[in-house]
A protein has these predicted regions:
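Catalytic toxin/effector domains delivered as secreted proteins or via bacterial secretion systems
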Residues: 2-103
Length: 103
């Protein structure tokens, strides 16, 4: 599919469309897709940068997140070693596994 009829195109973070260089981010963003409008020549970043040049916020990530982002963060608590996780814990495990599979 050709991108010619579209006014905006996407490029990765390695391709710089700005005239001034920024330092790399301190943390890896969830997305590294920025938008460049070829008609106006404006570059819209999905990250907010501080005065020191470091990115401190990725606009695609939420401010508040669930405490169980990773499978290893879920604690089983004190239980017998042969006891299986309950329904809520299984649900959290599956959710964390799905979330980690896209990274």
């Amino acid at each position: 599919m050709s991108r010619k009829p579209y006014k905006q195109f996407h490029h990765g973070k390695e391709i710089s469309k700005t005239t001034y260089g920024r330092k790399p981010m301190k943390w890896f963003p969830w997305t590294y897709v920025d938008t460049y409008n070829a008609d106006t020549g404006r570059f819209r970043s999905r990250r907010k940068f501080g005065t020191d040049g470091w990115a401190y916020k990725d606009l695609d990530t939420p401010d508040n997140h669930k405490p169980y982002d990773h499978v290893h963060d879920i604690q089983k608590g004190k239980r017998a070693p042969d006891r299986k996780p309950n329904k809520q814990e299984r649900k959290e495990f599956e959710k964390a596994k799905k979330k980690r599979s896209f990274l």
